Amino acid sequence: GPVDVKLEFVLYRKNVTLAELEAMGQQQLLSLPTNAELNVEIMANGVLLGNGELVQMNDTLGVEIHEWLS
């Protein structure tokens, strides 16, 4: 039968200390680097497959694929 693959679209990764994590509260804003939306990692089952760009598609968001890694 069909094989399921879990896709993830990663916008940004940031390391924080446990103290910083514990200090975060609801509705707190976390800043992203400039142009983070231009480099979205496309992962399948935890493996990096390629990258793309976050784009507006009418009333929703999507990822435009720029490159598949071999």
Please report, for each region that a protein language model flagged, where it lies by residue.
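N-terminal auxiliary interaction/assembly segments of multi-subunit proteins
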Residues: 1-70
